[in-house]
Regions:
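Beta-rich carbohydrate-recognition and catalytic domains
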Residues: 1-47, 55-107, 116-162
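Conserved beta-propeller blade repeats
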Residues: 52-53, 112
Length: 162
């Protein structure tokens, strides 16, 4: 989950667990660790890492996240962990950056959601905006794993969200 620090400036990613079938409320959740799982450290992340989405591939936990606040611009990064507590970024650059000026995601590529389909393919759904959040679009890209994480453009891209 993502939460701000006590000064309400930096958004950081923490980890928690709860028993199956619990409400995962304040009294049901338990911290995974004392430390923060991921905090903004790179220039493009600004003061915010949020919207964590994970997928497990070959025993590694990949965490996709939005870096920087909405439309400042937000871009998508990726970190990896063997234990779900200690994460390292796969790159110092965004995995999915904002688009060029005038494109559907020039203000933001953010709020990722990772999904593995029945065939084992992994897709990353995310939102984009070209007008500082007045209009939002949803896109889907396929993720390939190997010696590095690669994003492939898929057949569904930049559909307007109602």
């Amino acid at each position: 989950f993502a939460s701000r620090d006590q000064a309400l400036r930096n958004h950081k990613i923490w980890g928690a667990w709860a028993k199956c079938h619990s409400v995962f409320g304040r009294n049901a959740g338990h911290p995974l660790a004392e430390q923060i799982l991921l905090m903004p450290e790179l220039a493009w992340e600004g003061d915010c890492v949020e919207a964590p989405a994970t997928v497990v591939e070959d025993g590694q936990i990949y965490l996709f996240y939005g870096g920087s606040y909405n439309c400042t611009p937000q871009q998508i990064g990726c970190a990896v962990s063997e234990d779900g507590i200690f994460f390292r970024r796969v790159s110092n650059e965004p995995l999915i950056p904002c688009g060029a000026p005038g494109t559907w995601n020039s203000s933001e590529s953010g709020h990722p959601y990772a999904f593995r389909d029945d065939d084992g393919r992994v897709f990353l759904f995310y939102q984009g905006s070209s007008d500082n959040g007045k209009t939002w679009y949803i896109s889907r890209k396929e993720v390939h794993f190997g010696s590095s994480v690669r994003i492939l453009t898929s057949e569904v891209d930049a559909r307007e969200s109602k």
